[in-house]
């Protein structure tokens, strides 16, 4: 399922836009949110426009996401990623904290990567 209408591009086309999906895996308290924050900050330092999305029902830190050592970063709350698709189209890098809670994570990440975005989950 696509949230936007994209022109059809043949796989062999040299003008095909290429994005990427980076997945951060690990058990609880292993530093996944810290690594997400580190990667997004590196892109910000390189002058890329970034957006971080957090699960809206996680209300521990208001409109930011936080690591266990209390470092915070502004984040857009959402329950469904399709609800923030328009905001995501306006940036180059999309960070998604607690991706396992979003039922549309796979479709969203694939759609955004196919538009040339870097998606970090």
Swiss-Prot record:
<keyword id="KW-0237">DNA synthesis</keyword>
<dbReference type="GO" id="GO:0005524">
    <property type="term" value="F:ATP binding"/>
</dbReference>
<feature type="modified residue" description="Phosphoserine">
    <location>
        <position position="2"/>
    </location>
</feature>
<comment type="function">
    <text>Cell-cycle-regulated enzyme of importance in nucleotide metabolism. Catalyzes the first enzymatic step in the salvage pathway converting thymidine into thymidine monophosphate. Transcriptional regulation limits expression to the S phase of the cell cycle and transient expression coincides with the oscillation in the intracellular dTTP concentration.</text>
</comment>
<protein>
    <recommendedName>
        <fullName>Thymidine kinase, cytosolic</fullName>
        <ecNumber>2.7.1.21</ecNumber>
    </recommendedName>
</protein>
<feature type="binding site">
    <location>
        <begin position="97"/>
        <end position="100"/>
    </location>
    <ligand>
        <name>ATP</name>
    </ligand>
</feature>
<keyword id="KW-0418">Kinase</keyword>
<keyword id="KW-0067">ATP-binding</keyword>
<dbReference type="GO" id="GO:0046688">
    <property type="term" value="P:response to copper ion"/>
</dbReference>
<dbReference type="GO" id="GO:0005634">
    <property type="term" value="C:nucleus"/>
</dbReference>
<dbReference type="GO" id="GO:1904860">
    <property type="term" value="P:DNA synthesis involved in mitotic DNA replication"/>
</dbReference>
<keyword id="KW-0808">Transferase</keyword>
<comment type="similarity">
    <text>Belongs to the thymidine kinase family.</text>
</comment>
<keyword id="KW-0832">Ubl conjugation</keyword>
<keyword id="KW-0547">Nucleotide-binding</keyword>
<feature type="binding site">
    <location>
        <begin position="26"/>
        <end position="33"/>
    </location>
    <ligand>
        <name>ATP</name>
    </ligand>
</feature>
<dbReference type="GO" id="GO:0042802">
    <property type="term" value="F:identical protein binding"/>
</dbReference>
<dbReference type="GO" id="GO:0014856">
    <property type="term" value="P:skeletal muscle cell proliferation"/>
</dbReference>
<dbReference type="InterPro" id="IPR001267">
    <property type="entry name" value="Thymidine_kinase"/>
</dbReference>
<dbReference type="GO" id="GO:0004797">
    <property type="term" value="F:thymidine kinase activity"/>
</dbReference>
<dbReference type="GO" id="GO:0009636">
    <property type="term" value="P:response to toxic substance"/>
</dbReference>
<feature type="binding site">
    <location>
        <begin position="58"/>
        <end position="60"/>
    </location>
    <ligand>
        <name>ATP</name>
    </ligand>
</feature>
<keyword id="KW-0963">Cytoplasm</keyword>
<dbReference type="GO" id="GO:0005737">
    <property type="term" value="C:cytoplasm"/>
</dbReference>
<dbReference type="GO" id="GO:0046104">
    <property type="term" value="P:thymidine metabolic process"/>
</dbReference>
<dbReference type="GO" id="GO:0051414">
    <property type="term" value="P:response to cortisol"/>
</dbReference>
<keyword id="KW-0007">Acetylation</keyword>
<dbReference type="GO" id="GO:0060138">
    <property type="term" value="P:fetal process involved in parturition"/>
</dbReference>
<feature type="active site" description="Proton acceptor">
    <location>
        <position position="98"/>
    </location>
</feature>
<feature type="modified residue" description="N-acetylserine">
    <location>
        <position position="2"/>
    </location>
</feature>
<comment type="subunit">
    <text>Homotetramer. Tetramerization from dimerization is induced by ATP and increases catalytic efficiency due to a high affinity for thymidine. Tetramerization is inhibited by phosphorylation at Ser-13. Interacts (via the KEN box) with FZR1.</text>
</comment>
<feature type="modified residue" description="Phosphoserine">
    <location>
        <position position="13"/>
    </location>
</feature>
<dbReference type="GO" id="GO:0001889">
    <property type="term" value="P:liver development"/>
</dbReference>
<dbReference type="GO" id="GO:0031667">
    <property type="term" value="P:response to nutrient levels"/>
</dbReference>
<dbReference type="Pfam" id="PF00265">
    <property type="entry name" value="TK"/>
</dbReference>
<dbReference type="GO" id="GO:0046105">
    <property type="term" value="P:thymidine biosynthetic process"/>
</dbReference>
<dbReference type="GO" id="GO:0051289">
    <property type="term" value="P:protein homotetramerization"/>
</dbReference>
<dbReference type="InterPro" id="IPR027417">
    <property type="entry name" value="P-loop_NTPase"/>
</dbReference>
<keyword id="KW-0597">Phosphoprotein</keyword>
<dbReference type="GO" id="GO:0008270">
    <property type="term" value="F:zinc ion binding"/>
</dbReference>
<dbReference type="GO" id="GO:0048565">
    <property type="term" value="P:digestive tract development"/>
</dbReference>
């Amino acid at each position: 399922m696509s949230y936007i209408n994209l022109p059809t591009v043949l796989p062999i086309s040299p003008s095909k836009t290429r994005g990427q999906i980076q997945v951060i895996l690990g058990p609880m308290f292993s530093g996944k949110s810290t690594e997400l924050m580190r990667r997004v900050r590196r892109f910000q330092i390189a002058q890329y426009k970034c957006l971080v999305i957090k699960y809206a029902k996680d209300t521990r830190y208001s409109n930011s996401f936080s690591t266990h050592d209390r470092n915070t970063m502004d984040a857009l709350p959402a329950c469904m990623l399709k609800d923030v698709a328009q905001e995501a189209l306006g940036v180059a890098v999309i960070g998604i904290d607690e991706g396992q809670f979003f039922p549309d994570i796979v479709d969203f990440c694939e759609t955004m990567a196919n538009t040339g975005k870097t998606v970090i989950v």
